[in-house]
Amino acid sequence: MGREIISIHIGQAGVQVGNSCWELYCLEHGIERDGSIPADRKQSSDVNNLNKDLGTFFSESTNGKKVVPRAIFLDLEPTVIDEIRTGDYKNLFHPEQLITGKEDAANNYARGHYTVGKELIDVCVDRIRRLADQCDGLQGFLVFHSVGGGTGSGFGSLLLQKLALDYGGKKSKLDFCVYPSPQVSTSVVEPYNSVLSTHSLLEHTDVSFMLDNEAIYNICKNSLDIEKPTYTNLNRLIAQVISSLTSSLRFPGQLNLDINDIQTNLVPFPRLHFVLCSYAPVISREKAHHETITVDNITSAVFSEKNIMAKCQPNLGKYMACCLMYRGDIVPKEAQKAVQNIRSEKSRNVSFVDWSPTGFKCGINNQAPVSTKDSEMAEVKKSVCMLSNTTAISQVFSRINHKFDLMFVKRAFVHWYVGEGMEEGEFAEARDDLLALEKDYESVSASTEGEEQEEEY
């Protein structure tokens, strides 16, 4: 019985994160850049054990000589995907899985969703269907995109709608979305694209993992001592998180979690499915020689605000659920002890809503993390990735909503969207939906606080 996953990479952010992910998966599974597995490695029982679950992410070519990623890369203009077509991994992907249009979305959700996107959508849906037909038991989709750009937001939403129509609730849709940074903006209309895109994510995805470049930039700068981190540095760190999250689907382990476990444990209410990620240890090669990495200190590190990959303050919110995905040389007893320590340290401000008293789900995968040769990150024997659903995430939405309101009250830039066939009413509808989302988070927080105060008397 297969448990295959199809990865869909959309727009510049999605495609570049995808590059880093597939580079890392190949390294972890001992796959060459052209998708072949060297003969000497094929004979080794270690490698066979490692590659037992390879079929989750890779399909085998007809002649059995190489493996091909179950992935599709989509962009409305060719430059970013052309880099894959000419890059180190050009022979890894099937040429039909790299799909490009001729003109870009110009940072405009409506171009990605209505005009330019419409021309490409049928080809994309057809390729995805073909990939799905090759699977014995498709588990679901991982979708990667940004919500600030035109392609990531507009075309991403269009594709998610099509997946919802074609596969309904039968297949999980996990979404990795890069949200705009509080300080750094790549385009003036980011707040519009983000609100319109989030409106679609609320309806058409099961879990959305939120990332933001500024938070990840700061982690690279402070923990890896990179003075001016590049997108490659950022994407390699994101790839480690995604690799941790998917390692239990790709390798054997003592306490493996599959996609459904992650979903069931992280999403208490269908709308509140936006999740924060943090990862530890993020440590440079120079420092690694002088540090002792214990399960206790990496567990403690993922609860620290400075290791969270989106800008928000978890100590101001309540946790509804929390998944700890350990990797490497770790036994369940150590993980349990580390979690107990977190619970008992009141000073940490790790507080849960009252209806989720246990709150923690742990997964342990025996496969240690690896780093690419030219990565600044040290290779370590153990790591942990935390996925948390906390009411603090509403801070991200209120920030974007505020920026949206400043422009929309003047109807600034709205004509660019209406000119591409969108109706102005869609802005108001999306904004109302996000206001309702903020209120949903508030009510979860408030009900807990109210009951806590009653207990004090």
Swiss-Prot record:
Q: What is the effect of changing A288Y?
A: In strain: V34
The UniProt record gives the binding positions of GTP as Q12, E77, S146, G150, T151, T186, N213, N235
Cofactor(s) the protein needs: Mg(2+)
Looking at the keywords, is Nucleotidyltransferase present?
no
Give the GO biological process terms: chromosome segregation; microtubule cytoskeleton organization; mitotic cell cycle
| InterPro entries in the cross-refs | Alpha_tubulin, Tub_FtsZ_C, Tubulin, Tubulin/FtsZ-like_C, Tubulin/FtsZ_2-layer-sand-dom, Tubulin/FtsZ_GTPase_sf, Tubulin_C, Tubulin_CS
Q: What class of enzyme is it?
A: hydrolase
Query: What is the top-level taxon of the source organism?
Result: Eukaryota
Q: Which Pfam families match?
A: Tubulin, Tubulin_C
Complex and partners: Dimer of alpha and beta chains. A typical microtubule is a hollow water-filled tube with an outer diameter of 25 nm and an inner diameter of 15 nM. Alpha-beta heterodimers associate head-to-tail to form protofilaments running lengthwise along the microtubule wall with the beta-tubulin subunit facing the microtubule plus end conferring a structural polarity. Microtubules usually have 13 protofilaments but different protofilament numbers can be found in some organisms and specialized cells.
Q: Which family does it belong to?
A: Belongs to the tubulin family.
Q: What is this protein called?
A: Tubulin alpha chain
